């Protein structure tokens, strides 16, 4: 079973002015697609043949892990964004964020610090721990919270290819713009699962 590049859940220009169509063209059509192609080239003849992407992420290492995790991470990231995003969460998710961080503003500040402060290329995450509590995580490279038993709720891609066309080396400006696009409905579904 070959993995396929999932389509974006919106048009390439839908996230403008925060993320340009040009960025999505390179980020999705080239970078994300390359991980899919690489994974499909690495899987045949291995114990991972026929496994789900999530199973591969949880149990592989090396090149297979890096490409599988990057396919998973990017697909998740696209769904964390919406042209109708931004604002604040509501309901049980908002309550959990307030309980864990004191307020939405404090959460936003801490998530921003975590994402901006990720050394090199990586990902900033909001995760649900096994006990149901919320926490922030930063992963380097293709790192993914599934490997430590956490449930990803929200991610911000801080690999340079996510923002260099639009923001050059200004990662903080990109993360600031990210907040205008957060798909809280998707995050709430992850939290409820």
Curated annotation (Swiss-Prot):
Fe cation binds at residues 27, 74, 157, 161. Gene3D superfamilies: Fe,Mn superoxide dismutase (SOD) domain, Iron/manganese superoxide dismutase, C-terminal domain. Binds 1 Fe cation per subunit. Coiled coil: none annotated. Its EC number is 1.15.1.1. It catalyses: 2 superoxide + 2 H(+) = H2O2 + O2. Keywords: Iron, Metal-binding, Oxidoreductase. The keyword Transferase does not apply. It comes from the Bacteria. Its cofactor is Fe cation. Induction: By growth in a high-phosphate succinate medium (at protein level). Strongly induced by growth on medium containing FeSO(4) (at protein level). Pfam families: Sod_Fe_C, Sod_Fe_N. SUPFAM superfamilies: Fe,Mn superoxide dismutase (SOD), C-terminal domain (SSF54719), Fe,Mn superoxide dismutase (SOD), N-terminal domain (SSF46609). It is an enzyme of class 1 (oxidoreductase). GO terms for molecular function: metal ion binding; superoxide dismutase activity. The keyword Repeat does not apply. Destroys superoxide anion radicals which are normally produced within the cells and which are toxic to biological systems. Partially complements double sodA-sodB deletions in E.coli. PANTHER family: SUPEROXIDE DISMUTASE (PTHR42769), SUPEROXIDE DISMUTASE [FE] 2, CHLOROPLASTIC (PTHR42769:SF3). Belongs to the iron/manganese superoxide dismutase family. Homodimer. This is Superoxide dismutase [Fe]. It comes from Pseudomonas aeruginosa (strain ATCC 15692 / DSM 22644 / CIP 104116 / JCM 14847 / LMG 12228 / 1C / PRS 101 / PAO1). The gene is sodB.
